[in-house]
Amino acid sequence: MPKNNEIKFVDAFNLPNPGLRSYFDIVEEGQPEEYRTTFARGKSISQVLQEWSNYLEPLSREWPTLVDFENDLKAKVGPMSIMKPLKHRMEDIDHYYDDILLSSTPVSDSAVKAVIAEMKQIAGIHPRSQQKTVDLMKKSTNSGSPYFTKRRNVVDKTMFCSVDNLLQILNLPREDKNLDIWTWADDPDQSSEWIMAAVLGWRGQEGGPKRNDVKQRVVWMFPFAVNILELQVYQPLIESCQRFNLVPAWVSMEAVDQRITKMFDTKGKNDVVICTDFSKFDQHFNSSMQQAAKSILSKVLDHSYISENWLNGVFPIKYEIPLAYDYGKIRVGKHGMGSGSGGTNADETLAHRALQYECAIKAKQRLNPNSQCLGDDGVLTFPGITVEDVIRSYTAHGQEMNESKQYVSKQDCVYLRRWHHTNYRQNGVCVGVYSTYRALGRLMEQERYYDPEIW
């Protein structure tokens, strides 16, 4: 990764900050310890899973695909806390900047319009006030730049806030009554200006029984102020979708189960259901995908000045924000989806939904409306659907998909890590089954160290 000296660290962070330096020391050095919980103390992971398999294997006669689903996740159970040193993670960071450059075509207007039509019940959303937005936000997480402390410690230093390109303006004396956050009564003695920067973080995910099997996901820790501005739209957007059950996963798992049931009950008997699997969806979330999400949002929001300014000034931040990846080092440039954005899930869900519609439109068919997606996770069907249709359509927009990882079946599907089968029902509903092997793994392993005495 090339060094970039365009942004000085002191312009993005309130220094000195011992906590920030200590944090980046850990990022640079990594974390080699495996943290186990007290559950099944004294037993190896393989021993616990083997003992449990005696209860699961008898199900293979009646529900073979359920046991296949369980065994697939059994192979991935293992440590989650191992963190590689930064020097071994640079390639993962590069993917965010490189993968958006793959050949891509715009998502079709007809597909975007289909999603807009699906969202017509909630059209006219007006951005929420900053005060109400902050009241609903979690305050126990890190505030990111510039203060890098708990959010609750710097609410007063952050509110009210605005942005100007890559500049975040904090502690403004007031928010305009018309929610025009780009106009303020200037008070240089009170307000402060900082270059915005996301902070490199990580999430550990099980990938197998060995220490080097741990999957390390790049996390972009966003500035508190940027999240506030983003959530002025994404909070009411998600709440409106929940009200009309437009995205079942934003409502509840029960809503997902009901929609899956409708999908199986309305699809053709010989039509397959395809559970899509992307390779590095965040990293490949390029300008074509970004524009699809923005186009949909532009029709869901009202036509006010604040909405227009939000689309032009706040929406793009998650794709352009600089990344502080080490102490004193900040990388700039356009990139894929920053995971710590307040709109990550929403943008990806809207764009992914457009891909589902486009796939059916290209096949001259109608997407089964009970198809679903959330972020990069999706399940879809329409008459005559094939996995080749899906891959051909999705990869046209710069996405990478491995054909062998797409799950295809007429009777069952896996969505949001839960297995559903058209014949496995409770009170008529195709309820989802979470992997018991994965659950056992989460009971035994932890991503961070927690003192068992204060759990």
Where in this protein do the model-derived segments appear?
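Polymerase palm active-site segment centered on the conserved acidic dipeptide of motif C
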Residues: 382-437
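Short helix/loop capping segments that flank catalytic or ligand/cofactor-binding pockets
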Residues: 216, 229-230, 242, 283-286, ...
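Conserved NTP-donor binding/palm subdomain of two-metal-ion nucleotidyltransferases/polymerases, i.e.
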Residues: 426-455
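Conserved polymerase palm-domain catalytic core
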Residues: 268-374, 379-385, 393, 412, ...
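Reverse-transcriptase-like RNA-dependent polymerase core
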Residues: 162, 177-215, 259-269, 310-329
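Non-catalytic, polymerase-adjacent accessory regions of viral genome-replication enzymes
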Residues: 1-207
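Glycine/proline-rich, flexible active-site/cofactor-binding loop segments
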Residues: 205-249, 320-337, 346
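Active-site-proximal segment of RNA-dependent polymerases
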Residues: 220-283, 344, 357
